[in-house]
């Protein structure tokens, strides 16, 4: 039963976040070139073991996470400080940019 609820719950969370239809990937790239790239890299592949890779991540997930960091509902000292300065448009643009980066996964 739990196996069926988890995917359904995950899908519900993703669908609850409005899509960033009007997001501007180029504006997101410019924003990422500022603070974001220091930890997450311009290519979304972090060199910092404390920071996750963002390349190819689901756009709605990224937008939800950034919104929660900004609003204090998700806690990380660095991210709460950085996200506090982001507007809804900034969040949509960053999420669209990092989600648009294609990643090749090579199985072991």
Q: Could you say what each language-model-derived stretch is?
A:
Residues 32, 69, 97-98:
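Conserved hydrophobic/aromatic "anchor" residues
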Residues 60, 74, 84-108:
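C-terminal capping alpha-helices of c-type cytochrome domains
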Residues 6-17:
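Bacterial N-terminal signal peptides
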Residues 17-23:
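Bacterial Sec-dependent signal peptides at the C-terminal "C-region" and cleavage site
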Residues 23-43, 55-57, 106-108:
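Sequence/structural segment immediately N-terminal to covalent heme-attachment motifs in c-type
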Residues 22, 42, 82, 97-99:
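Residue-level hotspots at or immediately adjacent to binding/recognition sites across diverse folds
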Residues 1-5:
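Positively charged n-region of N-terminal signal peptides that target proteins for export
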Residues 29, 41-71, 80-85:
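Gly/Gly-Pro-rich "capping" loops immediately C-terminal to redox-active cysteine motifs
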